[in-house]
């Protein structure tokens, strides 16, 4: 036997109870066979687009090599890190912020887009590129194409806010507005790519895009002096390109670092898919953190995420708003909701998910993924931030509507600062009862120790015979109820429904057009959240015999909705 053969690695394979030795050459062939056997045809085709020296022995992408070979530094410098001084002090740990919000298009998306476009051959460059996006990916593709002098087309839904498509147009790309939603725009994008021979640049589900995003991990290890003390990196998750790239690199180079994904409760595509061990589409997806509002995680990104993600933390809107405020206080910069996801997840990981861990010995690195914040969202973020950080309480108080009752309630809340107080005399309630009339008060006030002070205030109110309910987590109260106090009415068979209306022409017309002539619209309150979605609360009087027809109307409408008829705020303030 030759020396060459002796040096080949051996692998033990069990077949039908018998063991056999497989040489190194045959091992490579076996791994390639297993790769084809266990992956979908679409993934095998995707991996085959890569060069041979960009693949591992099992024919899957070698992401460490792809990251090291990335072209992103032709167009950007490394994004800096910032010490989260305030966060570190409050959380009693070492927080270092990775500032992707400071890249040229204010988002990490430029990395993946540029890396893929830079690898196109001359014929592909001459034909041009196309992408479908109404957000950061669109700007990343446009910026990259302009830098490389490649024609680019960006397809966006018709309802895209003007500021977004104007930014893309300013970068030199042709903007095509098509369709009422992202799915229709995506279909048009695929059609144009086929007709014009354009190369489609996906937002996340391609090895070159993933590798471009993975350069973030390489920079973290270079920039953080005590990289050996990094306990976890917190990554916002939408389609999965960022977490796949960061995770694939870190788990090979610094496997001690945990990869923690962060999603919103209403867009938990990775969380749900990991639980079911397969990609799981979401029936509806929340849009507040619009940069991560994806119905289903990518196929390649999920394959990688299954191998590298240690945990996923879910957060809500209020927690995101509080994180935006935290970041502002540490950096004097305002990030978009998706950009604050990582900080919100880190805070929850420390305080709620893993309180048993000694976090004082760890360094945590949340990725601030972007800063494309719509200015008109700031009011909403500011309002909800205090709730997210537990510094404000919303309370519903029922007390006798007699002189002196309000004064007694205020004495209990004092010296806390009252931030809102709503009440209106309702003569109907007084006429309908022989008992002492009741007043329903909607109030909010500032607190330092939320749990302790809520308990204290409620006990003191109850001791006076007042009824108090904490409604800080009641979405109807926060979005609509506070603006409707005093408008109680007695409407037979009234149904109260909250909707998320798309901010586009015809949305209200479609809603009203579907109402039956026998249904009476009894309440309507709209509030814009500075996003592509507006929140609507509607009251509709529906005869009992038409309940099934009404339910079908709700389903066919296609808008996200919740039945709020039994909600405490409605029962106390809007109905008698």
Swiss-Prot record:
InterPro entries to which the protein is assigned, alphabetical: ACT-like_dom_sf, Ser/Thr_Dehydratase, Ser/Thr_deHydtase_PyrdxlP-BS, TD_ACT-like, TD_ACT-like_sf, Thr_deHydtase_biosynth, TrpB-like_PALP, TrpB-like_PALP_sf
Localisation per UniProt entry: Mitochondrion
Sample GO molecular function, one term: threonine deaminase activity
Entry annotated with the keyword Mitochondrion: yes
UniProt KW keywords: Allosteric enzyme, Amino-acid biosynthesis, Branched-chain amino acid biosynthesis, Isoleucine biosynthesis, Lyase, Mitochondrion, Pyridoxal phosphate, Repeat, Transit peptide
Subunit structure: Homotetramer.
Induction: In response to starvation for tryptophan and branched-chain amino acid imbalance.
Enzyme class: lyase
PANTHER family per UniProt: THREONINE DEHYDRATASE, MITOCHONDRIAL (PTHR48078:SF11), THREONINE DEHYDRATASE, MITOCHONDRIAL-RELATED (PTHR48078)
Pathway membership: Amino-acid biosynthesis; L-isoleucine biosynthesis; 2-oxobutanoate from L-threonine: step 1/1
Family: Belongs to the serine/threonine dehydratase family.
Other observations noted: Present with 11900 molecules/cell in log phase SD medium.
Catalytic activity annotation: L-threonine = 2-oxobutanoate + NH4(+)
Gene it is expressed from: ILV1
Protein name: Threonine dehydratase, mitochondrial
Taxonomic source organism: Saccharomyces cerevisiae (strain ATCC 204508 / S288c) (Baker's yeast)
All residue ranges annotated as the ACT-like domain in the record: 393-473, 495-566
One term under GO cellular component: mitochondrion
Annotated control of activity: Isoleucine allosterically inhibits while valine allosterically activates this enzyme.
UniProt modified residues of type N6-(pyridoxal phosphate)lysine: 109
EC numbers, comma separated: 4.3.1.19
Cofactor: pyridoxal 5'-phosphate
GO biological processes: isoleucine biosynthetic process; threonine catabolic process
């Amino acid at each position: 036997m030759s020396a060459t053969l002796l040096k080949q690695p051996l692998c033990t394979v069990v077949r039908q109870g018998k063991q056999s030795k497989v040489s190194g050459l045959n091992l490579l062939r076996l791994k390639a066979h297993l790769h084809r056997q266990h992956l979908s045809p679409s993934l095998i085709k995707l991996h085959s687009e890569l060069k041979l020296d960009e693949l591992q022995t099992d024919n899957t992408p070698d992401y460490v090599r792809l990251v090291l070979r990335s072209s992103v530094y032709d167009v950007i410098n490394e994004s800096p890190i910032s010490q989260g001084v305030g966060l570190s002090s409050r959380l009693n740990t070492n927080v270092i912020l990775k500032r992707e919000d400071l890249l040229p298009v204010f988002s990490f998306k430029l990395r993946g887009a540029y890396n893929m476009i830079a690898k196109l051959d001359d014929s592909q460059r001459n034909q041009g590129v196309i992408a479908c996006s109404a957000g950061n990916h669109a700007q990343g593709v446009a910026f990259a194409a302009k830098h490389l002098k490649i024609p680019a087309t960006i397809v966006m839904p018709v309802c895209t806010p003007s500021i977004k498509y104007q930014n893309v147009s300013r970068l030199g790309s042709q903007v095509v507005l098509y369709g009422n939603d992202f799915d229709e725009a995506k279909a048009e994008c695929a059609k144009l790519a086929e007709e014009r021979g354009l190369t489609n640049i996906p937002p996340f589900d391609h090895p070159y895009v993933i590798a471009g995003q993975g350069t973030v991990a390489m920079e973290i290890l270079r920039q953080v002096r005590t990289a050996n003390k990094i306990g976890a990196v917190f990554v916002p998750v939408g389609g999965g390109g960022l977490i796949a790239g960061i995770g694939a690199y870190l788990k090979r180079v610094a496997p001690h670092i945990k990869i923690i994904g962060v999603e919103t409760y209403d867009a938990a595509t990775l969380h749900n898919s990991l639980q079911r061990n397969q990609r799981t589409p979401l029936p509806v997806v929340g849009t507040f953190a619009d940069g991560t509002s994806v119905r289903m995680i990518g196929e390649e990104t999920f394959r990688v995420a299954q191998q590298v993600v240690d945990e996923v933390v879910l957060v809500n809107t209020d927690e995101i708003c509080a994180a935006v405020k935290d970041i502002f206080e540490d950096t004097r910069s305002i990030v978009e909701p998706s950009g604050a996801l990582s900080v919100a997840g880190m805070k929850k990981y420390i305080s709620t998910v893993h309180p048993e861990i000694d976090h004082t010995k760890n360094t945590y690195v949340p990725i601030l993924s972007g800063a494309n914040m719509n200015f008109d969202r700031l009011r909403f973020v500011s309002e909800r931030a205090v709730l997210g950080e537990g510094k404000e309480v919303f309370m519903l108080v029922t007390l006798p509507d007699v002189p002196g009752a309000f004064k007694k309630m205020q004495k209990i809340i004092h010296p806390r600062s009252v931030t809102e107080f709503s009440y209106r005399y309702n003569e109907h309630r007084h006429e309908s009862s022989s008992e002492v009339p009741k007043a329903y008060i909607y109030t909010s006030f500032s607190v330092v120790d939320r749990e302790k002070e809520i308990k204290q205030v409620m006990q003191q109110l109850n001791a006076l015979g007042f009824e108090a309910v904490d409604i800080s987590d009641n979405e109807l109260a926060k979005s609509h109820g506070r603006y409707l106090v005093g408008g109680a009415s007695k409407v037979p068979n009234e149904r109260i429904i909250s909707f998320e209306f798309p901010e586009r022409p015809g949305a209200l017309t479609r809603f009203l057009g579907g109402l039956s002539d026998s249904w009476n619209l009894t309440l309507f309150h709209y509030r814009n959240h500075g996003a592509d979605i507006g929140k609507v609360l509607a009251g509709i009087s529906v005869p009992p015999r038409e309940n099934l027809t009404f339910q079908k109307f709700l389903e066919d409408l296609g808008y996200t909705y919740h039945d709020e008829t039994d909600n405490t705020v409605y029962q106390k303030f809007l109905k008698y």
